[in-house]
């Protein structure tokens, strides 16, 4: 409700990468012997309860997304088959978007690829496209059972790869993070745009503050002289 009251238009429950909900899902980290551990149904209970509680708090018109591991990529961890079953339960819980990811901070399984400035100008081979989007194979498998839009963040670098995946309806949303910062000058351009918008306001406020302090100092000096 805090996010909604602050003007956000949705919220995501992070259940990947070894964070708390991900720890509950993984038998490698969840060693509980009560209703919250053991079977997959028990390990998924915490996440589903959080979703239900969130939905009750924010209502049906506020989007709830979940970020879920396709797998932990660790022996004895959360598996792809388990992940697909959790996707079914997430659909029953009525989430609005599923972001597919994988791994955790012990085994991220997310290795970047060298930046190719001409990537958008070259035909993208199927093998390259699959390698770019780390979890596209999983998205293809889970697509038939997913009742919510699918999002992939991780690996996309070429515009054509993104368009191909979207046009093939393998996913609905492409998430970007590092690619937005990779092109030379991206950070600088973003900073310049931000500064151009911010500096006039900051300059005016700073001048007003300086003028106010100057007037205050002048008044004190005048009183001391008197």
Task: Go through the PLM ranges and name each one.
Residues 1-195, 199-202, 226:
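Flavin-dependent oxidoreductase catalytic cores
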Residues 208-225:
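Intrinsically disordered, low-complexity, charge-rich segments with an acidic bias
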């Amino acid at each position: 409700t805090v996010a909604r009251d602050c003007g956000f238009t949705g919220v995501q429950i992070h259940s990947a990468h070894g964070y708390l909900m991900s720890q509950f899902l993984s038998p490698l980290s969840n060693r509980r012997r009560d209703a919250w551990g053991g079977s997959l149904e028990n390990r998924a209970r915490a996440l589903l309860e959080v979703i239900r509680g969130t939905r009750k708090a924010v209502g049906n018109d506020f989007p709830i997304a979940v970020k879920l591991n396709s797998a932990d990529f660790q022996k004895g961890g959360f598996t792809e088959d388990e992940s697909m079953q959790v996707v079914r339960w997430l659909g029953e819980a009525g989430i609005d978007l599923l972001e597919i990811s994988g791994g955790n901070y012990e085994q991220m399984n997310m290795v970047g690829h060298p930046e190719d400035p001409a990537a958008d100008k070259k035909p993208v081979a199927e093998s390259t496209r699959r390698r770019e989007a780390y979890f596209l194979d999983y998205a293809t498998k889970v697509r038939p059972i997913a009742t919510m839009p699918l999002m992939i963040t991780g690996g996309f670098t070429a515009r054509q790869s993104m368009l191909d995946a979207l046009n093939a309806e393998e996913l609905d949303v492409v998430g970007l993070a590092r690619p937005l910062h990779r092109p030379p000058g991206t950070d600088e351009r973003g900073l310049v745009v931000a500064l151009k918008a911010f500096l006039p306001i900051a300059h005016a406020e700073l001048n007003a503050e300086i003028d106010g302090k100057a007037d205050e100092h002048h008044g004190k000096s005048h009183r001391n002289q008197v």
